[in-house]
UniProtKB/Swiss-Prot annotation:
Homodimer. CDD domains: SelD (cd02195). SUPFAM superfamilies: PurM C-terminal domain-like (SSF56042), PurM N-terminal domain-like (SSF55326). The gene is selD. Pfam families: AIRS, AIRS_C. This is Selenide, water dikinase. GO terms for cellular component: cytoplasm. The active site is at U16. Synthesizes selenophosphate from selenide and ATP. It comes from Geobacter sulfurreducens (strain ATCC 51573 / DSM 12127 / PCA). Mg(2+) binds at D49, D89, D225. Belongs to the selenophosphate synthase 1 family. Class I subfamily.
Length: 345
């Protein structure tokens, strides 16, 4: 039985907000030796969503791993969100997920085995929806619950979509609204309205598969998924990798209804402030202390795709998304490199 168990009460931080902050991570990775392998097509140099390794003529592996803490209290839903979050990295690269392995850190003394069974069932159902096969996994008994997956996908090397290839003149399109990290903080505090919780869960359990398929149809210049470093953090990675500036229009960036009310109540994850403090030197904004900016730094879990498309491709993408009932909004444009990596207007 899993009723009455509040998973979020067992962890310090929820979802992707539990990741290491960008400053500490960059420092830890700064001394890594670059791999000298001609088959490694995408490595860690531009902080892309997944690695890509060529295994034959016209075929490459897309490899990623993602582990999160609970950001909702229902075990099955947590498992489904965690799997959607891990799969997203493969979709963002333009790949097709084929296999996955569970990674479980479980407090066996604090939770019954039925909780783990429900988590794994949720993850498995998301994998099946994505057309991927679960091939195994690994467990560790831990004081804090964590669950994620290592996912492998396939891709043609000529169809890899990177985060460092945005071009000046491109339009920026976002495929999910922001605010799930803030909502998760409210869930942990028992202060999230039921309707807002349900809406956040709907977005977090939604796979990025259809949006990624449309991306390939329309020919995006670049793509990344918006996760733990927030929209601005991942936009900075795109800008620095491509040598451009990304301009975001604050009023055009979608935020879940009700999130700003939670911000006003102080229900903002520490990871949001960590992201803001780290990326502030690279961002031009009217006022960095404006609360309206906080959702742009909010750590997202299973967030949407941030796409960089030529004006004509963006038009096709938005029109096709509308026809197919997919969420997509133009949120900015790509400029030649300026004084900042991301300019918020």
């Amino acid at each position: 039985m899993t009723e009455g168990i509040k998973l979020t009460s067992l962890v310090k931080a929820a979802g992707u907000a539990a990741k290491l902050g960008p400053a500490g991570l960059e420092q830890a990775l700064s001394d890594m030796v670059r791999e000298d392998d001609p088959n490694l097509l995408v490595g860690p140099e531009t902080a892309d969503d997944a690695g890509v390794y060529r295994i034959g003529e016209g075929l490459a592996l897309v490899e990623t791993v993602d582990i999160i803490t609970p950001l909702v209290d229902d075990p099955y839903t947590f498992g489904r969100i965690a799997a959607a979050n891990a799969l997203s990295d493969v979709f963002a690269m333009g790949g097709r997920p084929v296999t996955a392995m569970n990674l479980v850190f479980f407090p066996a003394c604090a939770l019954p085995g039925s909780v783990l069974s429900a988590i794994l069932a949720g993850g498995h159902d998301a994998l099946r929806e994505a057309g991927a096969c679960l091939v195994g996994g690994h467990t560790v008994e831990d004081d804090e619950l964590k669950y994620g997956l290592a996912v492998t996908g396939l891709i043609s090397p000529s169809r890899v979509v990177r985060n460092a290839t945005a071009r000046a003149g491109d339009r920026l399109v976002l495929t999910k609204p922001l605010g799930t990290g803030i909502v998760s903080t409210a869930i942990k505090a028992d202060m999230a309205p039921a309707a807002l919780t349900a809406e956040a869960v709907r977005w977090m359990t939604m796979l990025n598969a259809e949006a990624a398929g449309l991306m390939l149809e329309c020919g995006a210049s670049a793509c990344t998924d918006v996760t733990g470093f927030g929209l601005v953090g991942h936009a900075c990675e795109v800008a620095r990798g491509a040598g451009v500036t990304l301009r975001l229009h604050l009023e055009q960036v979608p935020v879940l209804d009700g999130v700003m009310g939670l911000v006003a109540d102080g229900l903002v994850p520490a990871g949001c402030y960590r992201n803001r403090d780290h990326y502030a030197p690279f961002v031009g904004a009217p006022r960095s202390d404006d609360d309206r900016l906080l959702p742009l730094f909010d750590p997202q879990t299973s967030g949407g795709l941030l796409l960089s498309l030529s004006p004509s491709s963006a038009g096709r993408f938005l029109a096709a998304a509308g026809d197919r009932g997919l969420f997509a909004l133009e949120v900015g444009e790509v400029l030649p490199a300026g004084e900042c990596a991301v300019d918020i207007v």
